[in-house]
């Protein structure tokens, strides 16, 4: 017998009364950055899930590689979070020991963008 499923978005609305849409998406993105896969079994880009060990293999001086990574990350985020209409992902700082990203997202029914600065540190994205 099949059990009916309730969309995750419904749970989001029921559990987060009083939390702004910006804060809700920020929390979801932080969970995404610190997980190995998203619901539905889709895997995330290796750099997002493995962080610095994977980063050491990337030529941080090559703008094409950094642009490729930003495109891959942008696509993964847009597949994961349907409330984002537009998203810009850019590398703020890239060295062999550091990686800092800047995300700017326009959410549905919101006039101000969500801006998120995120950095990989001590095995986690913060």
Swiss-Prot record:
It is found in: Cytoplasm. Inhibits RpoS proteolysis by regulating RssB activity, thereby increasing the stability of the sigma stress factor RpoS during oxidative stress. Its effect on RpoS stability is due to its interaction with RssB, which probably blocks the interaction of RssB with RpoS, and the consequent delivery of the RssB-RpoS complex to the ClpXP protein degradation pathway. One of its GO terms (cellular component) is cytoplasm. Pfam families: GPW_gp25. The lineage of its organism: Bacteria, Pseudomonadati, Pseudomonadota, Gammaproteobacteria, Enterobacterales. GO terms for biological process: cellular response to oxidative stress; DNA damage response. Belongs to the GpW/Gp25 family. IraD subfamily. HAMAP family: IraD. This is Anti-adapter protein IraD.
């Amino acid at each position: 017998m099949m059990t009916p499923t309730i969309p995750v978005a419904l749970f989001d609305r029921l559990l987060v009364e009083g939390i702004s849409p910006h804060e809700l998406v920020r929390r979801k993105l932080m969970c995404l950055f610190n997980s190995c896969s998203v619901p539905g079994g889709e895997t995330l880009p290796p750099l997002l899930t493995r962080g610095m060990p994977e980063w050491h293999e990337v030529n941080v001086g090559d703008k094409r590689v950094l642009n490729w990574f930003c495109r891959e990350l942008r696509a993964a985020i847009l597949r994961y979070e349907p409330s984002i209409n537009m998203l810009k992902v850019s590398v703020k700082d890239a060295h062999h020991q550091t990686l800092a990203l800047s995300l700017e997202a326009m959410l549905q029914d919101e006039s101000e963008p969500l801006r998120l600065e995120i950095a990989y540190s001590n095995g986690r994205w913060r």
